[in-house]
Amino acid sequence: MHISNEYLYEEDKKNYLPTFKRFPLAFIKGKGSRLWDADGKEYIDMLAGIAVNNLGHCHPKVVKAVQDQAAELMHISNFFVSPPQVAVSKLLVDLTGLKHVFLTNSGAESVEGAIKIARKYAHKRNKGGEIISMKNSFH
């Protein structure tokens, strides 16, 4: 049985919470800046996976690094230290001249972290901790 874009889209609608509009495309493969859907049609990925695939899909060095890391340790909480986190934090501090970095894996975590940092900063200075946001904004 061929699993088509239409089939996957309809099945997805049965189970996936509709918090935002999804397109009736099911991408099943990526290479560089190209994507292929379930019907075999080729596309240029103009979104780069919402900017997280800035080296393209399945870049050999990224695939190798992910495979190597997954073979050692998949994930631990930020409550603990890991060698890759120490290395990338040092690299970013050295490159930017900043004192510290805060690593996250999503826009939502980045915004939540920024709010907490801003509130902590304001609290230490006995200033207001009010946060202003845009109505109906995504993050």
Residue ranges and their predicted role:
Residues 25-45:
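Active-site and channel-lining beta-strand-loop segments
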Residues 1-31:
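Active-site-adjacent loop/helix segments that line or gate small-molecule/cofactor pockets in enzymes
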Residues 121-139:
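Conserved PLP-anchoring active-site segment centered on the Schiff-base-forming lysine
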Residues 42-126:
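Glycine-rich loop-to-alpha-helix module at the N-terminal edge of alpha/beta enzyme cores
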Residues 32, 100, 130:
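Conserved beta-strand and immediately adjacent loop positions that scaffold enzyme active sites
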Residues 6-7, 37-38, 63-64:
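Short, flexible segments with low predicted structural confidence
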